[in-house]
Amino acid sequence: MTDIKEFNLLDVRKNSQIIKTLNEVYKLWGYEEVTPSTINDIDTIKGREVINEDEIISLVSNKKLCLRPEMTTSIIKLISTRLINKKRPLRLWNNGNIFERKEGYKNSKKLKEKIQSGIELIGYDTKFPEIEIINILFDSIDKLKLKENTKLIFLVSTTSIMDLILKKYGSNQSEIIKKSMINLDQDELNTINLDEGFKYALKQLMFTRGEPNEVITKLTKHFGKSQILDDLSFLFDTIKPISDNYGIDIQLDPTFQPHLNLYAGIVFQLICINKDEKYVIAKGGRYDELVKYFNPNEKNPIGLGFSISIDNLRKLIKTGPKMERKILILYKNKELLSKAINEQKRLHSLNLISILELNPCKNTEIAELLKNNNGCSEILWIK
């Protein structure tokens, strides 16, 4: 089963408008466009364990290659080869399709094609590069003008919190504890051979989420003072005024972990709630280990970024793109055709969209029909 994208013209216009708006924001922040390959080396994806092997779409003609399941790995590989000598930090943006394989009906495999846009910030020697990335994400979504009565929630965590949890309570059963915490599975947690006091603490942590400083206070009671929590507190104190300015609610969820095994450090999702439906419109995080994997000699192996779901945003923007001025050029007598051709060239030189009807037209009703059929906003008669 394949979820093939076949867009109508309105959806195509919406996609183009969303991507154009996002690209304009990225450029203002000093980012440059890259176009990573759609085809990946399957061993690279498997070697980093970025995604489960059964979710990868391999090529029939060459089982060593696959369609990219995400953008970041391709871009990090690119900067370790083609862009290895370019000065850091690298600020890169990209648009394109990714391809997923998911479980379908009766164990069938469902192939999905998705449109993404995003940025990557590589080699920025600063303690909190997340501030720039998060600021750009908020700015990007703000420029898109979402529908009224939508609520935005910025869900944040760090893989370091899970490390704290497992270090204190994990004993020799870290993997199953981690799985139950991520899945919010109390039943599985109950089956683990673990001290009852530890189980009680883990259940408390499992459902600890909300306003960042309140959550950090609770975490401090569990783990004591820690640099990890101090750094988180500083990050939230910095981005809170920014999120308030954009009307975005921030929540810290210690057990949140992304599906892709890319990230180590800060991870996040931007969720939009509209009419009781939730849409993940962006996700991202920090992936220093991925940078080190592809280039062990990287001086500042710092990498982070985000991807935005164009497919979900298309459902949430206020309206389609505003209709641009589009002129239909008509003439009544064939002797005026040359003049009409020259007029079209003049309009094009002014960056005005114009369509020339090559057949003479003498009937105003037909003229109106031609205007509507061509999607034009006005008629210019050549006399």
Each predicted region: which residue ranges?
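TRNA-binding/sensing appendages of the translation machinery
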Residues: 1-73, 131
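Histidine/cysteine-enriched polar flanking segments
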Residues: 2-10, 53-55, 167, 260-261, ...
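Positively charged, Gly/Ser-enriched RNA/tRNA-binding surfaces
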Residues: 17-28, 40-41, 72-84, 94-147, ...
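A structural signal for short, well-ordered beta-strand segments and their strand-loop junctions
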Residues: 33-36, 92-94, 151-156, 251-252
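Beta-rich nucleic-acid/ligand-interaction surfaces
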Residues: 36-54, 153-164, 256-265, 363-369
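Acidic, His- and aromatic-enriched active-site or binding-groove loops in soluble protein domains
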Residues: 55-61, 169-194, 272-274
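Extended alpha-helical scaffolds
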Residues: 144-163, 167-179, 193
